[in-house]
Amino acid sequence: MTTTNGRRPIIAFMSDLGITDDSVAQCKGLMLSVCPDVTIVDICHTMQPWDVEEGARYIVDLPRLFPEGTVFATTTYPATGTTARSVALRIAHASKGGARGQWAGSGAGFERKEGSYIYIAPNNGLLTTVIKEHGYLEAYEVSSPEVIPEQPEPTFYSREMVALPSAHLAAGFPLEKVGRRLADDEIVRFERKDPELVADHDLVGYVTNIDHPFGNVWTNIHRTDLEKLGVGYGTKLRITLDGVLPFELPLSPTFADAGEIGAAVAYLSSRGYLALARNAASLAYPYNLKAGISVQVKVG
């Protein structure tokens, strides 16, 4: 089986199912049973269970990197066993560039072509960031007995309501036939916490996650937030974590710019957000830094 562009179908799979038992294998086995030629790419299966904001971060950048036609099967399903149903949506995407506005490298594959992608997820906010960043063309409730069991296993909706229908879609089942079309206000979103501008030149945000296993500290302050304040590489920043841990350092393009091993560095993560690290060492672990703590940035 090939898609209309001549490639084998692709499912990129993210879950909170972990890697210590056969749960992920069951989902993949079901995908392969429905769509034997599918290529399954693991995104992540060790996200914090039920944390839709963390999951949303892992799936928002993928259309810039995956071939058109990819189906993104993404799930954390705390409402398993209820009347909840998944949502499937199509996005169109034509974009170049990563965090710094262009790809590092000149290979032909780095210029993204225009194409469409399908996301399938619980309707619990997991697609909030995807919709904000990419918009969507159409969205449907996943309810047709042609793509989900009439009596789904009540404790395993990630398999029954995400993995199974994603395989049908990868195999060519029409998106518009998975269920009724959803109005925009029927798609659940979580409230995003954007950075706040204080006193015209200070930014206040928070730590979104620790970049394991390196111990780098990622924030919700985007490159564009910094650019509005005239910040570029070399601009001196005073950054305070959790109100008590100060750093004074310039924004740098690489870890090596910190100089000696263990020195602190402020940089843009691969996703385009302000981050803090130590050169070839962990910043988060010695200070026991966690997601959710405050970040204050003063320029100059």
From Swiss-Prot:
Q: Which reaction does it catalyse?
A: fluoride + S-adenosyl-L-methionine = 5'-deoxy-5'-fluoroadenosine + L-methionine; chloride + S-adenosyl-L-methionine = 5'-chloro-5'-deoxyadenosine + L-methionine
Which is an annotated Pfam family here?
SAM_HAT_C
Superkingdom of the source?
A: Bacteria
Task: State the activity regulation.
Answer: Activity is severely inhibited by 1 mM Cu(2+) or Zn(2+).
Chain positions recorded as S-adenosyl-L-methionine binding sites: 16, 21-23, 77, 158, 211, 216, 270-271, 278-280
What is the pH dependence described in this protein's record? Optimum pH is 6.5.
Q: What is the effect of changing residue 158 to A?
A: Loss of fluorination activity
- Please name the NCBIfam families in this protein's record: fluorinase (TIGR04507)
User: Any idea what job this protein has?
Assistant: Catalyzes the formation of a C-F bond by combining S-adenosyl-L-methionine (SAM) and fluoride to generate 5'-fluoro-5'-deoxyadenosine (5'-FDA) and L-methionine. Probably involved in fluoroacetate (FAc) and 4-fluorothreonine (4-FT) biosynthesis. In vitro, can also catalyze the conversion of chloride and SAM to 5'-chloro-5'-deoxyadenosine (5'-CIDA) and L-methionine in the presence of L-amino acid oxidase.
- What protein is this chain from? Fluorinase
The species this protein belongs to is Nocardia brasiliensis (strain ATCC 700358 / HUJEG-1)
Q: Which gene encodes it?
A: flA2
